[in-house]
């Protein structure tokens, strides 16, 4: 049974049903395995087009859970080459072929994406031979993007560099459809590019890291990780500058604290709408801006 729970939020707009922009959080987790929070991945739908932002662990399972057979997903955007954002790509690609996907899939990513895709496809040559020898199958077409806009049937996706500490070639994305905008920060610490792209956006999807003082003081490796992500004080600065209509904290690295603590701390210095993402949370940006859960 599919469940829908409208939560809140209405925006004034002249959009009609055919102009609806929808985003669904397939996975909102981190590298740590968690059945309630699978690997990071977001499905974006508008104008009969579907695309993915990142393909973390369990993406294909979540697509199956919402009844999506992958046939319309022809464009995937990878924010960076950390394994937790790309490990689900092989599963998506191979399983989509089982479902007889007719079209190839474009993979847009930073430097290194072509080498990654070549290696991935080579790894499964025996499987492909056994299953599809003499027949056509859907392939991956990997494209190394720079900061350019990519138009997918009126959905405009613009990658921009962020600041993920020691990680080179890390990106966020700005997604435009008609008069609606979504900004996805990617993995980043405080970044001017995120701020500049997110000013006045309808939805800012931003990562967060938060720890207790005790945990941080006693973990040298975590202190290094902490510097590569956006802490509570930094996200407050971002939000007070950007003033997005809605902020969704995503891919949350929480150590010794919980979501309620993070929201309390943010609300001390920022009065806008802030929530945490959940797996299978879906949002319609149209005449009404509705947030609901979808899934079996």
Language model regions located:
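Short regulatory "switch" loops immediately downstream of catalytic or recognition motifs
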Residues: 6, 121-128, 209-215
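Binuclear metal-dependent hydrolase catalytic cores
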Residues: 17-183, 194, 261-295
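Sec-dependent N-terminal signal peptides
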Residues: 4-13
């Amino acid at each position: 049974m599919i469940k829908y729970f409208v939560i809140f939020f209405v925006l004034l707009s002249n959009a009609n049903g055919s102009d609806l922009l929808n985003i669904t959080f397939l996975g909102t987790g981190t590298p740590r395995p968690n059945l309630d929070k699978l690997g990071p991945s977001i499905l974006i739908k508008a104008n009969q087009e579907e695309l993915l932002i990142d393909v973390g662990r369990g993406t294909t399972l979540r697509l199956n859970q919402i009844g999506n057979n992958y046939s319309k997903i022809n464009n995937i955007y990878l924010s960076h080459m950390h394994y937790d954002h790309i490990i689900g790509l092989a599963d998506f690609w191979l399983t989509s072929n089982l479902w007889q996907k007719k079209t190839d899939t474009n993979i847009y990513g930073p430097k290194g994406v072509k080498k990654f895709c070549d290696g991935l496809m080579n790894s499964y040559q025996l499987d492909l031979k056994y299953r599809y020898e003499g027949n056509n199958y859907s392939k991956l077409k990997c494209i190394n993007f720079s900061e350019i806009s990519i138009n997918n049937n009126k959905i405009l996706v613009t990658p921009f560099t962020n600041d993920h500490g020691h990680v080179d070639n890390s990106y966020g994305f700005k997604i435009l459809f008609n008069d609606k905008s979504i900004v996805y920060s990617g993995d980043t610490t405080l970044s001017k590019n995120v701020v500049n792209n997110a000013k006045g956006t309808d939805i800012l999807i931003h990562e967060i890291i938060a720890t207790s003082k005790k945990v941080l003081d006693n973990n040298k490796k975590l202190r290094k990780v902490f510097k590569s992500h956006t802490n509570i004080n930094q996200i407050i600065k971002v939000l007070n500058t950007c003033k997005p209509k809605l902020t969704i904290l995503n891919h949350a690295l929480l150590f010794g604290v919980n979501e309620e603590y993070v929201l309390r701390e943010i609300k001390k210095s920022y009065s806008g709408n802030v929530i945490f993402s959940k797996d299978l949370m879906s949002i319609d940006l149209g005449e009404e801006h509705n947030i609901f859960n979808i899934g079996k």
